């Protein structure tokens, strides 16, 4: 039901959140031609490019990202209002809400799995915190998929194997005769690259204890960009955890890094536990769990 939301806005939001024409066509139940026409019309009206087409994916321009940030809150409000004042006899569509830092590759896999299964869902992406999740799970017909674990809220935690594991980068000056000086590592902050913040820490803790003899590593979860992290690493101020696939993409030398295998990415699923369980919930959660378990990140 879209009697309040403009068609162009819905298509723009969907393409921003799926990054794919093929996925968007399944979500919106329309063919690719009308989607392309709407985006072309918008770009002509705005006199700005919205997306860059590359290898079957849509990369939003800076202009598109600015528009998205400004209109998304209004879109969420209108969508919630439609749900509230719509026909009461009609079953509300299940909402799948991804937090803003959830990996795009896994997000697309989940959307594809739900679409192929015939599950009718409304896909959304938004910034969340513990309070927002609590409100969503009390008032909306939704499942929130987050890269963060809010321990006070009951959730299902799914683990996805991380392809290649992660590399622990150690300052060059901490190496003696080709081996890390354990005494100098103790107490040195361990920074996380953005893609590694929601890895299962038990495996990483075990590596520090068994391999380096450090029982209480100084993990730091501050939001530090990659450039600043690499600078602190170079200056000997911190160690740095980066996924292997990111190292390959950036062409980083691993001469002064240790390989940690068996690492998994943790996904938390939040949903209204007090509501009467419905077939839609059971089916969607089972599909999401299965997809995350079988996939690699």
From Swiss-Prot:
InterPro entries recorded for this chain? LTTR, Tscrpt_reg_HTH_LysR, WH-like_DNA-bd_sf, WH_DNA-bd_sf
List where in the cell it is found. Answer: Cytoplasm
Which GO CC annotations does the UniProt entry carry?
cytoplasm
Q: What residue ranges does this record give for the DNA-binding region?
A: 21-40
Q: Does the record bear Transcription in its keywords?
A: yes
Q: Which GO terms describe its molecular function?
A: DNA binding; DNA-binding transcription factor activity
Which SUPFAM superfamilies does the record associate with it?
Winged helix' DNA-binding domain
* Effect of loss of the gene: Decreases expression of genes encoding virulence proteins. Decreases virulence in mouse.
Taken from the record, one Pfam family name reads: HTH_1
Signal peptide (UniProt feature, chain positions): none
The HTH lysR-type domain sits at 1-61
Task: Kindly state which keywords UniProt assigns to this record, in alphabetical order.
Answer: Activator, Cytoplasm, DNA-binding, Plasmid, Transcription, Transcription regulation, Virulence
Q: Name the domain of life.
A: Bacteria
NCBIfam families membership: PRK15243.1 (NF011779)
| Protein family | Belongs to the LysR transcriptional regulatory family.
Functional note: Positive regulator for the plasmid-encoded virulence factors SpvA, SpvB, and SpvC.
Q: What is this protein called?
A: Virulence genes transcriptional activator
């Amino acid at each position: 039901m879209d009697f309040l939301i403009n068609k162009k806005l819905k298509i723009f939001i969907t393409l921003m959140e799926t990054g794919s024409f093929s996925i968007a066509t399944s979500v919106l139940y329309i063919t690719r031609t009308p989607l392309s026409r709407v985006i072309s019309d918008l770009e002509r009206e705005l006199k700005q490019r919205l997306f860059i087409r590359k290898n079957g994916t849509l990369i939003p321009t800076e202009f598109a990202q600015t528009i998205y940030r400004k209109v998304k809150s209004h879109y969420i409000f209108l969508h919630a209002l439609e749900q509230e004042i719509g026909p009461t006899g009609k079953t509300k569509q299940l909402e799948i809400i991804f937090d803003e830092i959830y990996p795009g590759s896994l997000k697309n896999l989940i959307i594809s799995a739900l679409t192929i299964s015939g599950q009718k869902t409304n896909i959304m992406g938004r910034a969340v915190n513990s309070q927002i999740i609590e409100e969503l799970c009390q008032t909306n017909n939704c499942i929130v998929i987050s890269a963060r674990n809010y321990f006070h809220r009951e959730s299902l935690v799914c683990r996805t194997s991380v392809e290649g594991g992660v590399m622990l980068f150690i300052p060059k000056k901490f190496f003696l005769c080709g081996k890390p000086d354990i005494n100098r590592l103790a107490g040195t902050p361990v920074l996380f690259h953005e893609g590694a913040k929601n890895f299962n820490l038990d495996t990483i803790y075990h590596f520090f204890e068994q391999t380096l003899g450090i029982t209480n590593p100084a993990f730091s979860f501050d939001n530090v960009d990659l450039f600043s992290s690499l600078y602190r690493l170079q200056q000997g101020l911190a160690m740095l955890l980066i996924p292997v696939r990111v190292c390959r993409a950036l062409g980083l030398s691993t001469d002064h890094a240790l390989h940690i295998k068996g690492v998994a990415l943790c996904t938390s699923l939040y949903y209204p536990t007090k509501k009467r369980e419905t077939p839609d919930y059971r089916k969607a959660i089972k599909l999401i769990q299965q997809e995350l378990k079988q996939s690699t990140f």
